[in-house]
Structures are given as C-alpha cells and as structure tokens.
Amino acid sequence: AQIGREMVLHTSHRYNWVQLAGAVNHPEKGKRIDLSSDNDKLADIDDSSVILYPTDGYGNPDLLKGIIEVEKPDAIFLITDPRYFQWVFQMENQIRKNIPIAYLNIWDSMPAPMYNKEFYESCDALFGISKQTKSINEIVLGDKADSKVIKYVPHGLNNKIFRPLDKTNEELQKFKKHLSRGKDCDFMLLFNSRNIRRKSISDTILAWKLFLDELTPEKREKCTLVLHTEPISDHGTDLGAVIEYFFPENDGNVVISADKFTTEQMNMMYNCADGVILISSAEGWGLALTESLLTGTPFIANVTGGMQDQMRFEDEDGNWINFDKDIPSNHRGTYTKHGKWVLPTFPTNLSLVGSPVTPYIYDDRCSFEDAALRIQEMYEMGDKERCERGKAGMEWALSDEAGFTSEKMSNRIIEGLDELFNTWVPREKFEFLKDTDYQSRVLKHKIIY
C-alpha cells in the first residue's frame, strides 16, 4: 500500500489513475471514490485524476470488465504476488488485444520459478523490484523476454518523511524513552517487520542473547532490542514466550513495541535506533532496510532476495552487481565487498522447500551465531563510526545509482511505461498451438555459483 500510494502520488502529473482498492471486507465496496483534489494538494498539481473502486479481496473479472468499459484505461498495472491476480492472467487473451498489462513484480528467492512462466508471459512489461527478480523474469521467459519491456525498478520511499533527525531533539529523546520503556539506553537495536516465520525473529532474539552474554552487567543493562511487531501471530510465534525462555529476568533488554505509529513516528523510531537488524530468509525486498538507509541508520541483514541490492555488493570491476543464469544470487557469498553501512550475514543453509502452488524455493537462513557477531561488531563501532556509516548509506540511497526514493522510483516507472506505450503491439486475436508445443519446466541456471 505504501509503495502504491507513493507511485500514484509521484506519477499523477503524467498519468491518470483508476485503482481497485482491495480489503478483506471493504466497508465502501461498490462505490466510486474520487481522490483527485486530495491528490492535487499532496502532489502540488491541479489536474490529477485519481479514482478508487473499493472491493473485497483483489477484485474479480466482472468488476474489471466494468471498469475497463467505463474508465477506458490505456494499460493495466499490477502489483503483488501473481497468485492474487490469477483471474487477471486468465483474462489476458481478452485484455491484451486492446490494452497492455504491466506488472511491478518481485520473487523472494531462487531457484527461478518456472511455475510462474504463464504469469510472466501474460504481461507486456515486467518491472523487477529486485535485481534478482529482473534476472528471474529473463531466465523464466527465455526467448520470449525479447518481446517484453523488462526493467529494474527498486522500491523507493518518501525521503521527506524518512530522513535523519537531530539526535539531541527533546521530542526524539522522549520517544526513545517510550521505546525503551523508560530505560537509559546506550545501544538500541531495532527490528521492524511482521511476526512471520521467515523473518527469523526468534533467531534475532537468540543472537541478541549471545551478544549480551559477552557484556558486563553494567553494559548489558544499557542495551535494548526493540521488536516493533505483533507479539503473537499464527504465522509466526509467541514472542513473549521466546523472550521469557531466554530472558527469565528480563530487565528491559528486549522490548516488544506493538503500537501503531504514524509515518513521522516511524521516522523517529529509526532515528532512535543505533542499528537495524533483519535476518529474514527469502526476503523479497525488505522495506525496513530502505527506511534504515534513508534515516542514516546502519543495518545488519541476511544476504537474500532484494536485501542484497540494498547492501551494494561489487563485482570484480567495482560495479554494483547484476545477476544472470551463471550467478543468479549472491546468497552463496560469490561477492563479499559491500557498502560500509551494512554488516551482512550470509546464509549458512539453503534448504529447498515448497508447497503445491510454489513447488520449490530456497529457504536461505543465516546462523544466529553469525548474527550475534555482527551485533557485537556494530556495538563496538561506537556512535561516531555508526553515524558515518549510516550517512554513507543515506547518500547512496539518494543517489541516481540506487534511487531508493519515491521520486526516483516513479521516474523509473514512467520511463518503463513510456517505452511500453511506444513499443506495444496488441495480442493476436487467436493463435494456433500444437500438443507438442509444451516445454518442460526445467532448471535453466546454475545451482552452485
């Protein structure tokens, strides 16, 4: 939702938008809501057109057909997991005769998902949020990639909201006291994400314990791990029970923050932290790292998915790495030189897991022992070095190379859509297929790299 909002806001000077606004049970389902005047104020323009069609779930074919008939869009733009839009892809032979389909997509981990082939083939433009995803689109499509617009469009956030603050600011100091539950804190490490299994929160807690066990009681007392997440989740675990088990006399060393914060408060939270930690497995992007970068906060992260983009690993020529079928990911540590703002942990285990709809994907987990060493390294840096490293990360995130801001992300979207409109050829009304045309869904890249 955050990315979609920023994209619409920063492209509404160029395109009119009609959005299927989904929710589990949307209270305004069936309405047509005009947000143009509100968007004009936020975007500082006077001619935008932003229309919402609230709906339950992700929409349905009848609703989309009605919107196409009434609003007459020039393209359809999709964002999210392809399985939520199977019903759109099943209509592609009707839609693409008249208008193209663009898809801002991401895939969390290797191997390249050949089971997504039909989804990718149903699109005219594929904007990969991570470098790994762009490579996956090309690997899965094979020769058919030549007929698509395929671009790298990393996530970007509003750098007027997520920005460094004066650490001596009285309001910020009060907020830090709130986060630490009134405790004096010399070192605060922040986790900010959902309580789901692949976020490895329990491993983070265990790494924190190993780190604290090496400190004197006096130093330990002034260290706090803030977990900004749900305390209990069926998709994750009971964090209170985990904390009680490893910290039976918890004196504020681990704090769960379940408050709902405004974006300004979220920015303050990152500015309170000395570092951010996110050691997820199979992480598509990791917005917590983007927020960390824009606030000038160094981070500890697992080398996986889109998180490795935000670490700026370099190849042999000093260039920001790209991926292909020979080196489809850096989670094996092929490249080790990275930006100074990150302390990476490399996966120590790549386990092939899956489900009926996603038969194979790597669960690439780092060890909590490695994470503990990275925490200790960040702690021993001291405030000055952490600030210098965080500043370097912020400057890179704002640069044209990275461009992890709303404006630069939106400019990349505009470039991609303009290319699509200039090159798009409508789908043939019909095509002949032979029963021998089926291609087996087989491995197309190296396993060891």
Set out the residue ranges of the language-model regions.
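Short hydrophobic beta-strand element within catalytic cores of glycosyltransferases
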Residues: 298-301, 311-312, 318-325, 343
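Aromatic "clamp/platform" in nucleotide-sugar-dependent glycosyltransferases that forms part
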Residues: 281
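Extended catalytic core of nucleotide-activated donor transferases of GT-like folds
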Residues: 34-125, 131-132
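Conserved donor-binding/catalytic core segment of Leloir-type glycosyltransferases
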Residues: 181-199, 205-208, 225-226
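C-terminal amphipathic helix plus adjacent low-complexity
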Residues: 336-449
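Carbohydrate-associated surface elements
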Residues: 23, 132, 156
